[in-house]
Amino acid sequence: MLNTYFKIGDFICHVDRYDRETGLWGYSCDEIPVLNGWACEKFIEINKICS
């Protein structure tokens, strides 16, 4: 689950922490244009956001 990437609006987010007390995963988001070539190359195999 850690380092799983997903998209929220125009933000690319990744799961980066786990809270053992609550059992919840935490994530951070970076504002990266979805059609940006670098972002596509980096994330396309993970979650197919550039289809």
Label each PLM-derived region with a short phrase.
Residues 2-51:
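Acidic, low-complexity, intrinsically disordered interaction modules
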